[in-house]
């Protein structure tokens, strides 16, 4: 009675829940489910965290070349058949002995075919050999083209005179004459100052050298095509060459 009186005095009547066990069970299930969700979220975050950066040992040349044999084909124009035949041993020797590649001239397709083999140790050997043969086919001397195998920072660049200025007829012939000069003097001067090698084949110009030197030679040739006098071009390239020499 006292408890009832206190309950009535407070304004509340005590109520005993019959489903106490069910409520406890329900609360336990909810808490366990919430715990599992928390664990799952924690696992997701742990999986989402980037692991330590993997460190792999560098592969050797033999492991890199364990795939199929790679082949490069370089087409040879008709005007280069005779020079290729005369200089075949000079081309064959460095490619086979130094680079460890196989090379042959396919008489049916008129292509020089180069491929890797078991003796190939360097991955870049095939690209170097292809550039070497391509340079010779474009008209460079074997000794000059051989630098593509020995040095890594040499490149080939080709463009046409008509790409610089759309010339035709006698105007085109005069532009070619300005690039070559009397007895090849202008071409040799540009080669010596810029330390490049230049091949002038009709309307096509091929330049062999480093990136910066090719840029200087190309600028000089473009100025000659556009009509600048050779003396002015000489002065410009000498000034640029001296500045680049001081810089390095």
Swiss-Prot record:
The processes (GO biological process) annotated in the record are: ribosomal small subunit biogenesis
> Which keywords has UniProt assigned to this entry?
Nucleus, RNA-binding
What the entry lists under Pfam families is as follows: KH_PNO1_2nd (PF22891)
GO CC annotation: nucleolus; nucleus; small-subunit processome
Instruction: Give residue spans, biased composition: Basic and acidic residues.
Output: 39-50
User: Where is this protein found?
Assistant: Nucleus, Nucleolus
SMART domains, per the entry: KH
Q: Which region ranges are annotated with the description Disordered? A: 1-63
Q: Which CDD domains match?
A: KH-I_PNO1_rpt1 (cd22391), KH-I_PNO1_rpt2 (cd22392)
Give the highest taxon in the source lineage: Eukaryota
Per its UniProt record, what InterPro entries does this chain match? KH-I_PNO1_first, KH_dom, KH_dom_type_1_sf, KH_PNO1_2nd
- Report domain KH positions: 169-221
Q: One GO MF term, please?
A: RNA binding
Assembly and partners are described as: Part of the small subunit (SSU) processome, composed of more than 70 proteins and the RNA chaperone small nucleolar RNA (snoRNA) U3.
- Function, as annotated: Part of the small subunit (SSU) processome, first precursor of the small eukaryotic ribosomal subunit. During the assembly of the SSU processome in the nucleolus, many ribosome biogenesis factors, an RNA chaperone and ribosomal proteins associate with the nascent pre-rRNA and work in concert to generate RNA folding, modifications, rearrangements and cleavage as well as targeted degradation of pre-ribosomal RNA by the RNA exosome. Positively regulates dimethylation of two adjacent adenosines in the loop of a conserved hairpin near the 3'-end of 18S rRNA.
- Give the family this protein belongs to, as stated in its UniProt record: Belongs to the PNO1 family.
Its name, as the record gives it, is: RNA-binding protein PNO1
UniProt organism field? Rattus norvegicus (Rat)
| Top-level taxonomy | Eukaryota, Metazoa, Chordata, Craniata, Vertebrata
